[in-house]
Every structure is written in C-alpha cells, then in structure tokens.
Amino acid sequence: MVLADGRALHIRPIRADDAEALRRGFSLLEPEEIRLRFMHPMRELTPELARRLSTIDTRSDFALIACEPPTHGQPSPPIVAVVRASIQTDRRRAEYAIIVAHPFAGLGLGRHLMRRVIRWAQYRRLDEIFGDVLDENTAMLALADSLGFRRDRAPGEPGVIRVRLPLKRASTTR
C-alpha cells in the first residue's frame, strides 16, 4: 500500500516468526499510544507476549501487519501497525484491536487495515465486529464513526466505549 505521503508499506498476515519484528516495532510507539491501545501503560513487549501476539489460530483469528518493504539480506523491518480480530465464543461476533505507530498515523493506514478486517469478518459471515476504545482515544473513535460503527458504553468498564459495526448493513467503501 502507498500512504498519503507517498511512503510504501508492505501489508501481510502476521506469522509466528514476526515476534522479534513486533518487539522492534513496539519500541517505535509513544507511551500514550501504548496506553490508548492496551488500556494501561507498558514499558516493553516481552518476548512471551510478542510470541503470543504473533501466533494466531487462523480458524478463529485474523491479524495483518504493516512494515516497510523488506530489503533482501536484511532483518525483517519493524512492524509499524497491527490489526487483529478474534471470533468470540458465540461464533457470531469478532472483537478487533488495532495500533498504528505515530509516524504512520493519519495517512490512511488505519482505515485500510480496518477495511481489511471488516472484509474478513464479512467473509466469515459474522453478524458484528466490535472493539473497546478508551473514550479519550478520539482518533480511533473518529475512524470507527467514519466506517459506520455505533458507540455504546462498554459493560462494566468506566471510560471505555464499545464501538460496534453490524455487518449485514456494513459499508467498507467510505
């Protein structure tokens, strides 16, 4: 994909061997970006958590990463964005999460990744995709609004908004 500023990024499914690139990408994130995504501060992405995040069950999970195009003979470039979704136990809904490093934010990458995860959920014939967003995460709330998500309070979580997109009427062309 080509960003609004002309930079090219490689988008692909996450792989188990992405754990180290995921950790390198985590170091690009600002503390506030981490808090807004994980809903609590984290100083580092531990090797164990990186392994867990980079290993998915494709029967119920979906995850894409964005990185600069790989250079032959060089280590994998750091991952600068991740979107993931997991089908819930009811098999009718999926919960999504997304993070985009600040040097790549506001350039269409988040919208592109969200459209991809919505298409995956539609392909899986799910009824809804949803995510929990801190009410101060105005960028994510604005993106969700622009894609047709509805807002509700997350059950039992003060300061958290649940954004939901019913998929039978979803439009990913906005």
Regions found by a protein language model. Name each.
Residues M1-R174:
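Long, contiguous binding/interaction regions
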